[in-house]
Amino acid sequence: MIKRKITNLYDVEFVPFDNYGLPVEGMYWHKISYNKKNGGQGTYLLKMDPSAKSLPHMHTGFEEFLILEGELIDPDDKIFKKGDFVTFEPGSTHSSHTENGCLILVFMRGINQPL
């Protein structure tokens, strides 16, 4: 038996991003395989509206993401652009923002801790 799920990244429904409890303004996600109940393992699609900003957080495990559309900016002014694949190691802390909006495919290996 084949257990398979196919997700078209450009044909999904987004809900408010509430990974830390309350929704974060201007951020929306579609959980593909991400689940807090399994230790925060899995993948989700994240959409950020123009001027949206993530909450400051610490990575308890690896977080990797691929910028599909737009740009994302970290506090050190590093700009992640379309096609960039970014890896944050456990213990990394940051928050990110976008000026014009972005679409990101996120691969999680642990639950982020809000700061």
Residue ranges and their predicted role:
Residues 59-75:
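Glycine- and acidic-residue-biased ligand/ion/polar-headgroup-sensing regions
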Residues 90-115:
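Ligand-binding loop in jelly-roll beta-barrel domains
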Residues 74-94:
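Short acidic-glycine-tyrosine-enriched beta hairpin
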Residues 1-40:
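A short, N-terminal "cap"/entry segment at the start of jelly-roll beta-barrel domains
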Residues 40-41, 58-60, 78-79, 98-100:
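Short glycine/proline-enriched turns and hinge-like loops at secondary-structure junctions
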Residues 29-59, 89-93:
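Conserved short histidine dyad/triad with adjacent acidic residue
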Residues 49-51, 73, 109:
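Solvent-exposed residues in well-ordered beta-strands and their adjoining turns
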